[in-house]
């Protein structure tokens, strides 16, 4: 059956809006799309396997070397070992779409570094808006990539992509203004309902291991050991360390 959170988002999907009390509308849009095609749990979760397939495709596209065709089996084994990613292949949560559009953003940024053509600008702009429509945490993804390459601030094509993302995100910004920014106030000030305990940090560290699945030793060792060869690698390092430290503290 559906977990509690999925039932909560099903309730969102009954009345589509440009925003909800504690979330942007992406998850509600996806659930609404599914339940208009199928009834029950199948409809609620319909988008999840398609997003999972997109995740696998985008990860494959992010691998540059031609050697990947020789080790397709290893790639599939590695992807299948990431438990949380597999779970998002059938559960519909805000993080389900956030993962997909985060990968799209990373792919678009990589392409943007190689060639700043119209496609790169459009996809980069769209993906920035999409991650923000999934969760407000999407700003971390955009922010840490920007911090890794401040020269983007002098790039007119990057500002074009930013303008596109803002235009696409305007309906939600207007909605936020209309509700006096209640979701932001909730996340920033009202959500914490208990004093800090060391258990919170320990649980977070355990979750960091669980998220990586069975390959966590290899994944974290490679992340720490491999040097940054270019701006894209540097962005990945900033994302990894930045997100980890942000939620740690």
Which positions does each model-derived feature cover?
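Transmembrane-lumen/periplasm boundary regions of multi-pass, lipid-linked membrane glycan transferases
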Residues: 141-233
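Short acidic/glycine- and proline-prone juxtamembrane loop motifs at membrane-interface regions
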Residues: 87-98
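Transmembrane-helix motifs of polytopic, lipid-linked glycan transferases
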Residues: 46-68, 104-108
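Transmembrane-helix signature of polytopic, membrane-embedded enzymes
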Residues: 59-81, 99-100
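Short helix- or helix-capping micro-motifs
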Residues: 72-83, 128, 132, 146
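Membrane-interface alpha helices of multi-pass inner-membrane proteins
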Residues: 15, 120-135, 146-147, 164-167, ...
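Specific aromatic-rich, kink-prone transmembrane helix
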Residues: 58, 78, 97-114, 120-128
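Membrane-interface transmembrane helices that cradle and orient dolichyl/undecaprenyl
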Residues: 64-69, 105-121, 222-228
């Amino acid at each position: 059956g559906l977990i509690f959170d999925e039932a909560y988002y099903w309730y969102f999907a009954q009345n589509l809006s440009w925003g909800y009390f504690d979330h942007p509308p992406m998850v509600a849009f996806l659930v609404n799309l599914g339940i208009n095609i199928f009834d029950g749990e199948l409809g609620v979760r319909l988008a999840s396997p398609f997003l999972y397939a997109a995740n696998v495709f985008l990860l494959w596209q992010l691998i540059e070397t031609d050697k990947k065709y020789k080790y397709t089996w290893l790639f599939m084994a590695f992807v299948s070992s990431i438990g949380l990613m597999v779970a998002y292949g059938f559960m519909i949560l805000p993080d389900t779409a956030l993962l997909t559009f985060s990968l799209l953003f990373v792919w678009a940024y990589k392409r943007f570094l190689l060639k700043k053509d119209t496609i790169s600008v459009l996809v980069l702009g769209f993906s920035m808006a999409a991650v923000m429509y999934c969760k407000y945490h999407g700003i971390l993804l955009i922010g840490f990539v920007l911090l890794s390459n401040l020269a983007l601030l002098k790039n007119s094509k990057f500002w074009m992509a930013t303008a596109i993302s803002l235009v696409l995100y305007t309906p939600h910004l207007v909605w936020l203004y209309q509700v006096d920014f209640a979701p932001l106030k909730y996340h920033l000030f009202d959500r914490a309902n208990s004093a800090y305990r060391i258990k919170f940090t320990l649980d977070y560290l355990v979750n960091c291991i669980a998220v990586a699945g069975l390959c966590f030793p290899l994944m974290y060792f490679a992340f720490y050991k491999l040097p940054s060869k270019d701006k894209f690698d540097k962005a990945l390092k900033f994302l990894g360390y930045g997100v980890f430290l942000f939620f740690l503290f």
